[in-house]
Regions:
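Compact, well-ordered interaction domains used in eukaryotic information-processing assemblies
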Residues: 96-97
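Charge-rich, low-hydrophobicity low-complexity segments
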Residues: 1-84, 90-92, 129-178
Length: 178
């Protein structure tokens, strides 16, 4: 669509943010949106890097392309929008209304609170530990080429697992977590 193309053009014009240790962003407060590029194209699975987002506040992060794994630690009021993660997305310490939109084979959520919202497409049930006041919804982020990338990553169809999280702090077989 025209809107998606416009968004992609804006994203492409943004400055790439990374450092030498691994693709991602660290120690950022506010400022312009950050773009982290993963592997693109038909062979993305074999070239996909890990991505690390640490100690971020009050910013937007766009993960474009395919990543092998995603590790988020200590994010406050951060919005993360991303394409496919072939393995695990570990989301630890999301606070103050963080919003994460990600498609991943597995998602583990630790110590999320204060209105964190997770928009997920996963091939397994999300694991939740030591978290409260967290909302879940289906993955909705789009950009041109994302559909093909999701198919190649085995995440093309939404299995609905975003609504079936296992809260390890609430082991009750007959009642959903509060």
């Amino acid at each position: 669509s025209a809107a998606a193309s416009s968004v992609l053009a804006k994203i492409a014009a943004m400055e790439l943010h990374a450092d030498a240790s691994a693709p991602g962003a660290r120690d950022v407060v506010g400022g312009d949106p950050l773009v982290v590029r993963g592997a693109l194209g038909a062979d993305a699975a074999s070239a996909a890097p890990d991505c690390v987002l640490e100690r971020l506040a009050d910013c937007d992060v766009f993960l474009i392309g395919t990543f092998r794994a995603l590790r988020c630690h200590d994010l406050a009021n951060v919005r993360v929008f991303g394409g496919p993660v072939l393995g695990s997305a570990l989301l630890h310490g999301l606070t103050r209304g963080c919003r994460v939109e990600i498609a991943a084979a597995q998602c583990r959520v630790h110590d999320a609170r204060d209105g964190a919202a997770l928009y997920l497409r996963t091939s397994s049930r999300p694991i939740i530990e030591h978290s409260s006041d967290v909302a879940f919804a289906p993955f909705a982020f789009e950009y041109p080429g994302l559909g093909d990338a999701l198919e190649r990553a085995g995440l093309g169809a939404d299995a609905g697992t975003w609504r079936e999280g296992d809260d390890f702090g609430w082991i009750k077989t007959h009642r959903a977590s509060p």
